[in-house]
């Protein structure tokens, strides 16, 4: 009995399995292409063979996608029938399940489903983070994880050198060759148009690699004439801890760099947090530039300061994968359970964050100074939900305390005041009268503003 072409194809696949070509090869598998792969390693590649609508991140799967993934896994791995009713959830909920949860919902196949999901997550993660940089067919602007915003033309270009073959991918990591052309604010020379086949990748990150120091800029035209040529130096890009990139199905020949011995390594570390760094003249962000010594070891380099105006002209907005910075926000002045102005002033004096607005001159004598009257008025306005509060309006409320001998202005001193009573002594008095006076003062201010 002769075999049909379909049966021959299935038989051939069982004998020798060849992973399908993909524009983004799997990072998890280190087995060379076109080599028979054992059954134990097939799970590393099987997620690529998922149906097209399941090739998204599992967190974006709908409930129907989860059910179809269970059905696909049951057929692909010859598992026992899986009750899809025990997995009535979307992809986000599926990722919350532990291995024990999978075993509880599917006693016979739960461990396989859990491991398969972990392999899918492992393969999808580097595909999003690194594919725009290492595969020329992909566009950076289509990836939501990496945003490179550029408003000015850059003089630094990135050219990819020749890709390694599948045999020497571990020995010779691919490099990115950065070509630096010096800039002069006075003279501009004509630059030849780049080779369209090279397709340089331009980004604001290029300027962070090499930047002329202020001393070098001060040398003027002499430095411009000496450095008016491109200086290539290679950078070895390592997206994984194995320090290599996966091979591509189609090699792209490029002229190799003449300085291969001085390769610099950039370790791309994925981070769960993509925190935006908005670079503007009010913020100074220092990026550490690692340098390689002659023996190949990393040494900490000097920070590259990005607070200069000319640097900011080339780097406006960069999405950098870093941990969130510590919060140093200016306090807005809202204090709970604080209705009266004297109590509010006492609370501010007890908080060191407000020393730029008000502070003690002599705490024993209860003498305080208003450092920033307009800023203090804004804090009081924020506390009272009065955005148009001014120091003149706030000082009217202070005058009521003069009459009640609670606060006194120091004679001959500007913006220097003294508390005549302690908070306990003030609270034991007629606080209801104080609240009435301050409320009346605010009502009069609102009425006057409405009349205007």
Curated annotation (Swiss-Prot):
Keywords: Acetylation, DNA-binding, Isopeptide bond, Nucleus, Phosphoprotein, Repressor, Transcription, Transcription regulation, Ubl conjugation. One of its GO terms (biological process) is regulation of transcription by RNA polymerase II. Its main location: nucleus. InterPro entries: Ets_dom, ETS_fam, Pointed_dom, SAM/pointed_sf, WH-like_DNA-bd_sf, WH_DNA-bd_sf. Residues 339-420 bind DNA. One of its GO terms (cellular component) is nucleus. The modification Phosphoserine is found at residues 22, 213, 238, 257, 323. Residues 154-262 are annotated as: Disordered. The modification Phosphothreonine is found at residue 18. Transcriptional repressor; binds to the DNA sequence 5'-CCGGAAGT-3'. Plays a role in hematopoiesis and malignant transformation. PANTHER family: ETS, TRANSCRIPTION FACTOR ETV6. Belongs to the ETS family. This is Transcription factor ETV6.
């Amino acid at each position: 009995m002769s075999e049909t072409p379909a049966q021959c194809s299935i038989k051939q696949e069982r004998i020798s399995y060849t992973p399908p070509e993909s524009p983004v090869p799997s990072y998890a598998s280190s087995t060379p292409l076109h080599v028979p792969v054992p059954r134990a390693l097939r799970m590393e590649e099987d997620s690529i063979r998922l149906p097209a609508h399941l090739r998204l991140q599992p967190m974006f799967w709908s409930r129907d996608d989860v059910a179809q993934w269970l059905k696909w896994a049951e057929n692909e791995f010859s598992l026992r029938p899986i009750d899809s009713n025990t997995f009535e959830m979307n992809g986000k909920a599926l990722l919350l399940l532990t291995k024990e949860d999978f075993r509880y919902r599917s006693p016979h196949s739960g461990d396989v489903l859990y491991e398969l999901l972990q392999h899918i997550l492992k393969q999808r993660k580097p595909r999003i983070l690194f594919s725009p940089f290492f595969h020329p067919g992909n566009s950076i602007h289509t990836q939501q994880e990496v945003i490179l915003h550029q408003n000015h033309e850059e003089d630094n270009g990135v050219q990819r050198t020749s890709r390694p073959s599948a045999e020497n991918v571990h020995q010779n990591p691919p490099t990115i060759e950065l070509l630096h052309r010096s800039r002069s604010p006075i003279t501009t020379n004509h630059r030849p148009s780049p080779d369209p086949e090279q397709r340089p990748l331009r980004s604001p990150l290029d300027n962070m690699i090499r930047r002329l120091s202020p001393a070098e800029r001060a040398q003027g035209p002499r430095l411009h004439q000496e450095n008016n040529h491109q200086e290539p130096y290679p950078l070895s890009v390592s997206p994984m801890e194995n320090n290599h990139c996966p091979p591509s199905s189609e090699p792209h020949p490029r002229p190799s760099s003449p300085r291969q011995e001085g390769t610099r390594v950039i370790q791309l570390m994925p981070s769960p947090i993509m925190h935006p760094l908005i670079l503007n003249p009010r913020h100074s962000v220092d990026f550490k530039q690692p340098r390689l010594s002659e023996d190949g070891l990393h040494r900490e380099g000097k920070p590259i300061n990005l607070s200069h105006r000319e640097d900011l002209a080339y780097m406006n907005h960069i999405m950098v994968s870093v941990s969130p910075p510590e919060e140093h926000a200016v306090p807005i002045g809202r204090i709970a359970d604080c209705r009266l102005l004297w109590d509010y002033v006492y609370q501010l004096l007890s908080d060191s964050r407000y020393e730029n607005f008000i502070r003690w001159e002599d705490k024993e004598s209860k003498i305080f100074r208003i450092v920033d009257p307009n800023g203090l008025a804004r804090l009081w306005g924020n506390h009272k939900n009065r955005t148009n509060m001014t120091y003149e309006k706030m000082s009217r409320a202070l005058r009521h305390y003069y009459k009640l001998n609670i606060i006194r202005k120091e004679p001959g001193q500007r913006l220097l005041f003294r508390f005549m009573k302690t908070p306990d002594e003030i609270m034991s008095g007629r606080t209801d009268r104080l609240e009435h006076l301050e409320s009346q003062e605010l009502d009069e201010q609102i009425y006057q503003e409405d009349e205007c």
